Amino acid sequence: MTDAAIKDEVRRQLAVMREGAVDFYGENELAARLTVCLKEDRPLRVKLGMDPSSSDLHLGHSVVLMKLRRFLELGHTPIFLVGDFTARIGDPSGRNKTRPALDADQVKEHAKTYVDQVAKLLDVSAVEVRFNGEWMDQMTPGDFVRLCSQATVARMLERDDFSKRYASEVPIFIHEFLYPFVQGHDSVALAADVELGG
């Protein structure tokens, strides 16, 4: 592929990726990664993680699953991550109070249905399905402390959900601070180029 053809393809794919998006963070970085992938003739690795905090996905999940399907249609590698480890922590995102953590048995029961439900919108044979317990359950306490040493409390409080709760004097528990570290480590473990959320 010529440089001009690569530029055109990057523009085309970015337009497809932007369709229906409310927020599109890191577009310049994504364009650079996509350019490298096209030059190397390899797909982007696109991660979508969902915690099995209930037994069923809901209608809102279909929007981001359809976006994952668009990446597949563009020739990229979709990764559907079942957050079996993170569900045991409880996702604080967008919450004004602590989300209850689930025990391992509840998570296992809920996770059973997720892949079947995703298969209604995606060809799961073309999707890399993973569980973050694969690597997080193997991590030693020392490994986890080293991971957490990569950020400060001040930086964590910059997150909208935490800053609002802190300003309102709503408790933020330590395990909730750990959740974003696990999310970030998931992306590293999966060598994800793109992370979808919503």
Language-model features: where?
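NTP-dependent nucleotidyl-transfer catalytic core
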Residues: 1-198
